[in-house]
């Protein structure tokens, strides 16, 4: 059984559709973060993961633009990887 970790539909009918397609997704779980990165790599996107200075959250950047916000368990995982938990 598969459950969605994040979903962003491309079928929009309202004027806010273009905004929603470009709005960053929110990554809260380790598995969601890892799956998101794999999908970006399959598209051959060059991405970076960055933690905020106060380490309260993180970001995934593509070409300098935030494409995902990282919080919760996923952020804690990144802090563990960086040895800053």
From Swiss-Prot:
Location(s), subcellular: Cytoplasm; Nucleus
Domain of life: Eukaryota
Chief site of localization: cytoplasm
Keyword line: Cytoplasm, Nucleus, Phosphoprotein
PTM annotation (Phosphoserine): residues: 22
GO cellular component, one term: cytoplasm
Name under which the protein is recorded: Uncharacterized protein YBR085C-A
Source species: Saccharomyces cerevisiae (strain ATCC 204508 / S288c) (Baker's yeast)
Lineage of producing organism: Eukaryota, Fungi, Dikarya, Ascomycota, Saccharomycotina
